[in-house]
Design a protein with these regions (language model features):
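Short gly/ser/thr-rich secondary-structure transition/capping motifs
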Residues: 1-3, 23-30, 80-84, 139-141
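Metallo-beta-lactamase
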Residues: 69-133
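Cap/insert and terminal regions of metallo-dependent hydrolase folds
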Residues: 68, 145-172
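A short helix->loop->beta-strand "cap" motif at the edges of active sites that frequently abuts
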Residues: 16, 62-66
């Protein structure tokens, strides 16, 4: 697993070369650019805000990667292969199982410069099972009761927001 800055991560193993929330262009926290990812086969998008959706369309179109997101986000993303999940839904992909988890946050998608936002469905997180490990990416969210349920089931790696103001904070 590689931290790419902000909420972006790369997860590799078991046939998965995946990106989570690939906000790279304009992200001062990353040395990476979209062109650095040539073999990505899945992209997981927690919600539609630009600092999470990021470079998803460009990378997905260039690599042929499948985007995993809500049905509403899949409807907004044109010209990409998309697998829709909703909160509580799960699917077994060739590399392993993915479950979409609840998040308390918005999910508007910016459409053009100064044109406002369109509805991008609910925000979520992902529990990704690959190579015998369970990776939980919470997306942007406040603290939720469901996080405790995930902990009871066992999570090997938890990727949690700690920014405060728009999300939970380090004290949570």
């Amino acid at each position: 697993m590689t931290f790419l800055g902000h909420a972006a991560f790369r997860v590799e193993g078991g046939g998965l070369d995946g990106l989570i929330d690939p906000f790279l262009t304009g992200n001062s926290m990353t040395p990476f650019s979209p062109g650095d990812f040539k073999d990505v086969n899945y992209i997981f998008v927690t919600h539609g805000h630009g600092d999470h959706l990021g470079d998803t369309p460009d990378i997905a179109k260039r690599t042929g990667a499948t985007v995993v997101a809500t049905v509403e986000m899949c409807g907004v993303l044109e010209g990409v292969k998309c697998h829709a999940l909703q909160i509580g839904g799960a699917f077994t992909f060739p590399f392993g199982r993915v479950k979409m988890t609840p998040a308390w946050h918005g999910s508007g998608v910016q459409v053009g410069e100064g044109e406002g936002m369109v509805y991008g469905g609910v925000a979520g997180g992902f529990l990704i099972e690959v190579d015998g490990r369970r990776i939980y990416h919470a997306g942007d969210t406040g603290l939720t009761v469901e996080m405790g349920l995930l902990a009871e089931d066992g999570v090997d790696v938890a990727l949690l927001p700690i920014g405060g103001n728009y999300t939970m904070d380090i004290d949570d």
